[in-house]
Amino acid sequence: MSGYDNDFVSKLEHSKEVVRDALNEYDKVAVACSFGKDSMAAIHVAREVDPEIPIFTILTPYKPVETFEYLVDMDKKMNINPIVYLVGKEVPPILKDNNINVKLLPTDKFETACKEAEKESGKPIYEYDPDKCCTLLKVDPTKEAVKDLDAWVCGLRNTEGRTRKDYKEVEKRGLVKINPILTWTEEEVLSYLKENEIDLHPWYSKVFPDGRRIRSLGCAPCTVPIYDNQEERDGRWQGTSKCGGECGIHTQRLK
């Protein structure tokens, strides 16, 4: 741990202890992964405690192609072996060709909502009703992913934005949620990934002419670059009432 200061060494050990306690208390536990920086840190911490802990991810038709490519790349490098939940009729070729385990979910509700959004506004659903879009493509699939779990682990952090300041390391509301890196800073996450030679999603390396960059990763239409003096999640859902907010996975009961 030569690359860490003493404060972070203590913080890291505490994060592992949070995961260890969860695994000792609950039988069925899995880690949720968005393949953003925080998820990758959470996965690595959890796998340090239990190398066999299951991983699941929720993909959407609007995720950038780089996310699919990054998933495949990191699966090979880290043996993540994720179960992918996706509202769709066909497994994306890149996932099929690389033997990624994909569970396709029905598309009828999403297709109906898309048609209604287009008819009522002339806009795609992610612009007209981002809450419904997130519910159908993220929240409902997450409910499917966790239905047999006793607890789930995620990379939520309380310094990401205004909506995450009051979360606890262990949340017990319907389904137990474990937030082992809750108190980590953005800088600590990036340092941890670098120290452990974990590649970042390529979108994080994009720097725009005005100095803005991607700091929180989501679906392509709903992710924009922001300045360093903004909160990390300010680049999510800009131009909508959800700006800097939540998709619903962390605010709605999942079970």
Region spans (language model):
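Nucleotide-activated chemistry modules centered on ATP-dependent adenylation/adenylyltransferase
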Residues: M1-K255
